[in-house]
Amino acid sequence: GFAQQVTAPEPEFINSYCVLTSDSTFDALPKEDGMISKHQNKFGKFAKIAGAVGDLGFAGGMIGVSTAGSASGAINGLRVMGTAAGVGQAADAVNTLAGAEGMDIAFAGGKSAYTVKNASNGIRLLIKGEKNEYDPMEIYRIVRFKASKKDRRIQWMEFKPALIGSAETKKRGYVAFTGHKYGNQSYLLEIPASEAEPGEYGIFYMSIITATAIPVGTFSINK
């Protein structure tokens, strides 16, 4: 399979996002923290959620989740992501960002500090986790941001892994990829060449099992 030709060592640190530059070498990607903000297009059904999120002080807050205590808090159907309560169940890991549904997650600056040199054969990402027993399609999302001079944004949406690669999720900026375990505690994710269009990208890690914040690895693909 595709993982067998790769001989690169596992990254040194947990939650390191790396891009393979050959079968045996990689570069570490920069990590950035996003801010939750109101979606910049028309709201429609998300207006109520946005209002509730604003009232709870989510808007403009860092995306993060408390590991103190395992209380699950739901206010107006939103999961609490602030310091008051964390979502304690591993099974709920993918719901960390549920409170951000329909909101934009924005990153300062119009461009990542890292540009992929050659994306013509697709992009291979190597990510070290706590362990690699989860399906990477459930715990990672790769997005193509809407980029302006001032920031990069993605409207957050929740969907099952089976929808990765569907027309609807791709239209919203969610990139199709495949994932496999690699080594003792890493994952190898592959973005096919057909998806590796010029633009600004981010890799979201959605599990909250040990995370107190959600680091997002970013990269650019030039024309």
What is the role of each PLM region?
Residues 4-168, 205-223:
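Primarily secretory-pathway and cell-envelope proteins
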Residues 113, 189-190:
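Short, solvent-exposed loop/turn positions at domain surfaces
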Residues 117-119, 181-183, 195-197:
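Solvent-exposed loop and beta-edge segments used for protein-protein assembly and interaction
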Residues 122, 184-188:
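A generic structural signal for beta-strand entry/edge sites
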Residues 158-184:
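Extended, solvent-exposed segments with strong compositional bias
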Residues 185, 192-204:
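A glycine-anchored, Pro-Gly-centered beta-turn/N-cap motif
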